[in-house]
């Protein structure tokens, strides 16, 4: 991972346009090719970013100090450096991945056992389908025989959608599986995550933990 702290301005050109005026910012360039720009007041959420696969070109000559990031759709993130305060690279190695909490692990097990929760005619291929970047929670087929990758969270936020997006990009390269569509499943899905998922063609499924466990809601009982 490369970390750059710089005074810079940022312009995005794609389905819409956006501009970040000059200010000190943190730029992360990850091994997967993603580039994200961060301020000091938004927790983990970037001000702007470009998801992989994308290419970073650092300008030379008259273009020195201008970084251009282009993704496969032709969208551009142009970062104009005014002053670089820090620039370092670090080899983090292969991450062991997130260890799911008890509820998420149980949700995965329950949903695999009741895969028709996602729709009539769904069949399970396998849980923890391994890929080069980590395991997909559930891989299944819909009633039409299409492949579906399911990412399960207790609380569905943007980072979960990004994770599923990376899995889908990889799975769709496999001719034996493609086309693969995604379903983001959680007990609660944040509005921003739902908007991002919908924009990327990913379905959303709210999971009722008690219903999956076969526990009736007392409020629905008449006696």
From Swiss-Prot:
Molecular function as annotated in GO: DNA binding; single-stranded DNA endodeoxyribonuclease activity
Report the function annotation for this chain: Cleaves both 3' and 5' ssDNA extremities of branched DNA structures.
| Domain of life, source organism | Bacteria
Q: What is this protein called?
A: Endonuclease NucS
Q: Which HAMAP family match?
A: NucS (MF_00722)
List, alphabetically, the InterPro entries matched. Endonuclease_NucS, NucS_C, NucS_N, NucS_N_sf, tRNA_endonuc-like_dom_sf
Q: Which UniProt keywords apply?
A: Cytoplasm, DNA-binding, Endonuclease, Hydrolase, Nuclease
Q: What EC number(s) does the entry state?
A: 3.1.-.-
